[in-house]
């Protein structure tokens, strides 16, 4: 019999004892007889009221214990002292002071794969006090069993210029660090947890150690030579040759998007358009443009011809200018799936804010990092039942192409120039409008593979972007709308615990 049942039995015993006293006293009158008749009704009412209150308290206790148990089981590598504090904090937060009953000590027991939590609350009675039962002890116990599954997570994080304001970048770093710490706990590595990072802005930096087999090394892609007239310079045949002509610059690791529809797909790189073309921002004119870093050989040629002219690159030296062929490649290199906690924390801390927002580019690379397909091979197969995969996408703004009122019609980004029509149009506004549908398409592609997709709009007021991100998430419950700097850490902590592959057993 549970504690509530024991208290009810005690109340019934005391009630019968009281009836016995009345029966032994034969000097009563009608009032006493009436009182005796009334007492069963009062007792029944008292038992009903206090029993209902007791079960309500038990429900409060169980809910609070569930929250605490999930928090503890979601921190597999943490110390016992930390877990005890964590459990108490979550229990307190979910057992409000307005709840009935005063909770006693929280008991935590840690097994290999099972976390057991119990607590008891003391509940003052109402009507049962008449029969000498002044309080009741109501207890609850839960077990949380960790499933022995692996976890692969990729955080696709906005590193655009707007993240540098209002403390947003630091808040994001702190939140992402919190997620890593929760999942890894005190362990420097865990065999079954692997996390990747994809910082994005106007593109993504895949790193200079990206496999050459996935890069277009010879100019085979249809977009490789679109900005230059290579036929006029026989010693230069592709963008790699052009980098070699600049003695103080080399490729920084950013790549262009593949031609449509490959820009939205995880098709392995094999040949031609499936290969990635290196980022190479051309030297532009000095007036009305963004990226002027070389003297034009013949300024009378006109905007387009001057930009295509390769002669100015031959044996060139750029010096200290911040402009050049890597202009716009401001992002830190992505981090493939790894279980190296220190590496993850270091790469998160190194992120910086610069550039415009290309959500589909970042999201597509997040998918490729978690995919079992090349160019990254760290991810396990989608149909592997022993692993859960998740992508966390955070943005602080709408998709922006970086349009311009010059002949290029935009800044140079991962999509090249708008004038080249790689977004299906040469109109700047129409090209920018294509970015939202692309984002939605990639979201669906990711979800179709069974990958869990979380989305966060960070201090975003634009309702269209909010709707886009909510639709991208696996479910509305996995979309988090515009948290403050302080709330962002709570969001990442909630996501970390949701990803802990837990089930409750009682």
Language-model-derived ranges and their functions:
Residues 2-11, 52-59, 68-123, 178-211, ...:
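Short amphipathic secondary-structure patches
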Residues 120, 156-159, 198-201, 394-397, ...:
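Active-site-proximal beta-strand/loop segments in catalytic clefts of secreted hydrolases
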Residues 2-84, 161-164, 473:
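Alpha-helical assembly-interface signal, strongest on the long, hydrophobic N-terminal helix that forms
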Residues 2-5, 13, 126-166, 175-181, ...:
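Low-complexity, S/T/G/P-rich flexible repeat/linker segments used as non-globular hinges
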Residues 91-99, 212, 442-506:
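Von Willebrand factor A/integrin I-like adhesion domains
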């Amino acid at each position: 019999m549970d504690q509530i049942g024991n208290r009810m039995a005690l109340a019934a015993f005391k009630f019968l004892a009281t009836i016995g006293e009345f029966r032994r006293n034969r000097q009563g009158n009608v009032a006493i007889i009436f009182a005796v008749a009334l007492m069963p009704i009062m007792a029944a009412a008292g038992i009903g009221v206090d029993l209902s209150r007791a079960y309500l308290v038990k429900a409060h206790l169980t809910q609070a214990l569930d929250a605490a148990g999930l928090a503890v089981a979601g921190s597999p590598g943490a110390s016992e002292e930390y877990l005890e504090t964590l459990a108490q904090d979550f229990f307190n937060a979910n057992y409000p002071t307005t709840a009935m009953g005063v909770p006693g000590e929280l008991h935590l027991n840690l097994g290999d794969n099972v976390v057991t939590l119990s607590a008891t609350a003391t509940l003052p009675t109402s009507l049962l006090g008449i029969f000498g039962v002044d309080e009741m002890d109501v207890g609850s116990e839960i077990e949380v069993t960790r499933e022995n599954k692996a976890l692969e997570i990729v955080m696709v994080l906005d590193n655009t210029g707007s993240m540098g304001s209002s403390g947003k970048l630091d808040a994001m770093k702190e939140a992402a660090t919190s997620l890593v710490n929760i999942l890894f706990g005190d362990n420097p590595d865990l065999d079954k947890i692997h996390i990747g990072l994809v910082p994005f802005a106007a593109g993504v930096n895949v790193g200079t150690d990206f496999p050459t087999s996935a890069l277009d090394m010879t100019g085979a892609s249809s977009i490789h030579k679109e900005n230059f007239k290579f036929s006029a310079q026989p010693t230069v045949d592709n963008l790699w040759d052009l980098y070699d002509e600049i003695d103080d610059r080399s490729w920084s690791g950013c790549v262009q998007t593949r031609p449509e529809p490959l820009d939205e797909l995880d098709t392995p790189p094999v040949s031609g358009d499936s290969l990635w073309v290196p980022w190479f921002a051309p030297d532009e004119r000095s007036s009305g443009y963004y990226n002027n870093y070389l003297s034009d050989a013949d300024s009378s040629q006109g905007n387009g011809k001057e930009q295509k002219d390769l002669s100015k690159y031959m044996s060139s030296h750029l010096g200290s200018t911040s402009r050049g062929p890597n202009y716009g490649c401001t992002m830190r290199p992505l981090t493939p799936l790894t279980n190296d906690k220190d590496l993850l924390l270091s790469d998160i801390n190194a992120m910086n804010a610069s550039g415009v927002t290309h959500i589909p580019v970042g999201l597509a690379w997040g998918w490729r990092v978690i995919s079992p397909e090349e160019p990254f091979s760290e991810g396990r197969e989608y149909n592997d039942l022993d692993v859960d995969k998740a992508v966390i996408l955070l943005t602080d703004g709408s998709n922006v192409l970086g349009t311009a009122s010059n002949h290029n019609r935009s800044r140079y980004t991962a999509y090249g120039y708008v004038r080249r029509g790689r977004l299906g149009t040469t109109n700047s506004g129409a090209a920018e409008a294509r970015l939202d549908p692309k984002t939605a398409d990639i979201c669906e592609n990711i979800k179709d593979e069974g990958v869990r997709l979380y989305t966060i709009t960070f201090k975003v007021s634009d309702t269209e972007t909010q709707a886009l991100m909510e639709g991208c998430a696996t479910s509305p419950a996995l979309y988090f709308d515009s948290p403050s700097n302080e709330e962002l850490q709570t969001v990442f902590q909630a996501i970390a615990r949701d990803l802990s592959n837990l089930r409750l057993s009682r």
